[in-house]
């Protein structure tokens, strides 16, 4: 049956049809929906792991147990999982194991623009790269077969446009292979030096076998048309090339590691001028040049930054550009902002007022760095804020009382706990704030270990942030739970904890305003006669407030009656809503 699917749904369908039994992932745009769609299949066990490293390690365990297993993560998540990834190449598999990584060219929702193809080469793992939803489904199924044939995890790489674009797929029934028996084999699975040195030989043999395989497999194909110009490309870039130059000859790469160098060489001999079109790093181009294949152009034309497009490809080639129509007026800008009623707004307003140095982290709250809040000083990676604050305060102890670190509840579980342990163990004196909004918010409301619910909405033990911190050695009297919508109380508690000569944890606890069970109040009302146009309330960054004609106005369609703006108004011009 033919269906229209986004790439992520097609990957999930592929692992379902391949008989995958076990999926463990951590949410990360643009990969999140793969695991959410997989959870919709009753035959597939799917879970949110505490982080990507845990997810991959769990999937390796499921593979050794004899079940086809899968994990998905965004590109920076693969950094977290890199430790088990490299050794998993040595250990190999029992049943098939597929590791999907979703890159984010143009940095739509990430902190960097890294190219994950390098991981395949560095870890010596085969990597497939689909160019549409149909290939997402087909390549996922084939990846399990490759994994079992060559006794290796197989990587599947997508990018944002493939993950979130729709195209037709042909679905089929699920074929579930029986569980493979687990046989103890210390010479394979126990990766200590004496074993690993032997397994390295096996890894190199597998890669050599895969180099032969990629020269004949149908993941890679030659599309001969006009021989005057030829393109070597893969993934989303293939779609741009085909639309920009429909009459050109193309060598489409589906297995990006190992590359089919000899087939590319043969294709190069058939065209007059050869170009390489790929997003981000010159991964394919570098390999071709190293093999002595003459290239008329590549990254010197397309550049290293951002996404490609049909327009950019034609422009890079010096071709005429299609006519465009200019709108009479530009659309208004829509900068990313926190939602109306967001519990983080109150906290960040307090932090901004106190003029503290604030070490930030990854999540919705990263938006606290933007105007008008301007509350965050740094953002590095998941879980970094507590550790960065520790280093900062150790070097500049006189500033320790004027600095805090913030991270979210899901991020705390992901990689924040170790920061608390490190701070306590190394006699740090810092104030760490956990923003507990009862959900993993930025990636679309996923459950996490602090919510008491699994991915499949099964009740689970609720991990208590306060108890974890106390167990890590933070004095119980220095662990405070505060409602961030009470800005006066938050200010008081912050000052108290900053004054202490011991580590402190403040849990800023209020559920995300978008959660279905959260009850909202009536929209607030503005008394126009009392409003002085001072804009103090506008510093909250609430999208339900706007300033026009010298006064503040409320968008009743957005206002949830949280009352934060009432607390900021010195003229009592903002009142509770009335039915």
Feature roles, as predicted:
Residues 43-50, 91-102, 184-187, 427-438, ...:
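A glycine-rich helix N-cap at a beta->alpha junction
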Residues 37-43, 241-251, 467-475:
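Short helix-loop-beta junction
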Residues 104-153, 159, 186, 194, ...:
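Conserved thiamine diphosphate
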């Amino acid at each position: 049956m033919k269906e229209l699917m986004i790439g992520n749904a097609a990957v999930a369908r592929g692992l379902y049809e391949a008989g995958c039994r076990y999926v463990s992932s951590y949410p990360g745009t643009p990969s999140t929906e793969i695991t959410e769609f997989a959870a919709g299949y009753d035959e597939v066990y799917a879970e949110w792991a505490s982080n990507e490293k845990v997810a991959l390690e769990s999937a390796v365990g499921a593979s050794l147990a004899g079940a086809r297993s899968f994990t998905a993560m965004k590109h920076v998540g693969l950094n977290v999982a890199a430790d088990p990834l490299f050794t998993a190449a040595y250990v190999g598999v029992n049943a098939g194991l597929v590791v999907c990584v979703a890159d984010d060219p143009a940095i739509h929702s990430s902190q960097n623009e890294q190219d994950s193809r390098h991981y395949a080469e560095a870890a010596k793992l085969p990597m497939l790269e689909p160019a549409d939803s149909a290939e997402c489904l087909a390549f996922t199924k084939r990846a399990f077969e490759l994994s079992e044939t060559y006794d290796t995890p197989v990587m599947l790489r997508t990018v944002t446009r493939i993950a979130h674009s729709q195209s037709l797929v042909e679905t089929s029934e699920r074929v579930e292979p029986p569980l493979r028996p687990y046989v103890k084999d210390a010479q394979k699975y126990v990766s200590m030096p004496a074993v690993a040195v032997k397994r390295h030989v096996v890894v190199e043999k597998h890669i050599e076998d895969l180099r032969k395989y990629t020269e004949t497999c149908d993941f890679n194909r030659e599309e001969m048309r006009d021989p005057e110009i030829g393109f070597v490309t893969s993934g989303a870039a293939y779609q741009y090339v085909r639309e920009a130059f429909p009459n050109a000859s193309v060598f489409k790469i589906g297995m990006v590691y190992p590359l089919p160098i000899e087939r590319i060489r043969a294709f190069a001999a058939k065209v007059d001028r050869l170009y390489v079109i790929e997003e981000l790093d010159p991964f394919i181009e570098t390999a071709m040049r190293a093999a002595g294949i003459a290239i008329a152009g590549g990254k010197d034309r397309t550049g290293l930054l951002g996404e490609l497009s049909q327009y950019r490809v034609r422009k890079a080639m010096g071709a005429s550009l299609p006519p465009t129509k200019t709108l009479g007026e530009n659309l208004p800008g829509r900068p990313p902002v926190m939602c109306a009623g967001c519990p983080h707004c109150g906290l960040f307003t307090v932090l901004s007022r106190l003029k503290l140095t604030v070490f930030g982290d990854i999540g919705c709250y990263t938006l606290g760095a933007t105007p008008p809040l301007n509350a965050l000083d740094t953002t590095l990676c998941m879980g970094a804020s507590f550790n960065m604050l520790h280093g900062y305060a150790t070097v500049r102890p006189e500033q320790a009382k004027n600095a805090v670190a913030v991270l979210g509840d899901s991020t705390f579980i992901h990689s924040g706990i170790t920061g608390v342990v490190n701070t306590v163990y190394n006699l740090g004196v810092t104030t760490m704030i956990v923003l507990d909004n009862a959900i993993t918010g930025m990636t679309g409301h996923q459950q996490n270990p602090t919510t008491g619910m699994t991915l499949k909405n099964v009740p689970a033990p609720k991990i208590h942030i306060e108890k974890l911190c106390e167990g890590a050695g933070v004095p119980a009297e220095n662990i405070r739970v505060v409602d961030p919508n009470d800005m006066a109380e938050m200010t008081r508690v912050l000052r108290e904890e900053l004054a202490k000569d011991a580590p402190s944890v403040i849990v800023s606890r209020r559920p995300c305003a978008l959660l279905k069970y959260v009850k909202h109040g009536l929209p607030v009302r503005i008394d126009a006669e009392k409003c002085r146009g001072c804009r103090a309330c506008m510093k909250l960054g609430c999208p339900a407030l706007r300033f026009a004609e010298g006064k503040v106005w409320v968008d009743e369609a957005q206002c949830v009656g949280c009352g934060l703006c009432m607390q900021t108004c010195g003229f009592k011009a903002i009142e509770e809503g009335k039915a």
